[in-house]
Each structure stands twice: as structure tokens, then as C-alpha cells.
Amino acid sequence: MALGNSFDLTINQGETFNLTVTWTDSSGSPINLTGYTARLQVRETYSSTATVVSLTSGAGITLGGAAGTIAIVIAASTTAALTAPFSGVYDLELVNGSVVTRLLQGAAVVTPEVSR
């Protein structure tokens, strides 16, 4: 996956959200994420101070080292507590020392749950 990709997220209220992506270089080889940390935040708008969802390495995000994978999980109990319908923005950043790379960004939409 190239840097700075725009990719919209649809989060279903009350459902476990799972997304796994692989960060690759221009030749398609995975980038080794050993030593990296990650963070993902969802906000109502870019300028909002409050976060709707906030994940970090070890707390919703798991990095796959040499495989270059980034697994994002939002628990069903967390998505159930989200206001729906909702439309906001998010980004996913990888941090290696003092270098921050925005890997993904886009709209984050929460669809309402019907079954309870």
C-alpha cells in the first residue's frame, strides 16, 4: 500500500471492526515495521479536539514486524457505544523514532445497528 492513501472506513455499530493492511514499498515488498508504533484517531472534523475513536499499538492496533501488516480492531462494545449515523474523518500514522508517516486517511462512517 502506497503512502498517503485515501481509504474510507465503514464501521458498523455493535459489530467488531477488523481491518488488516500491509505496508509495501514500490516493488510490492512488505516494509519491516519492527520498532514502529502506530496510532489511529477518528474525529468529527479535522479541527475537532475530541476523538470518537483512538487506537494505538497494543490497544487496538497490532503491527506484524517484517510482514509489514497492520491489524486494526475495534471491539463490538466500543462500536456499540458510538453515535450512529455518524460521518467524520480519520487517519492512521506509523511512528519510527521521530519520523511520522501518515499511511491512511479518509472518511469514517458509522452505520446504525438495527439488531440489539
How should these model regions be labeled?
Residues 1-116:
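Contiguous segments within soluble domain cores/interaction surfaces
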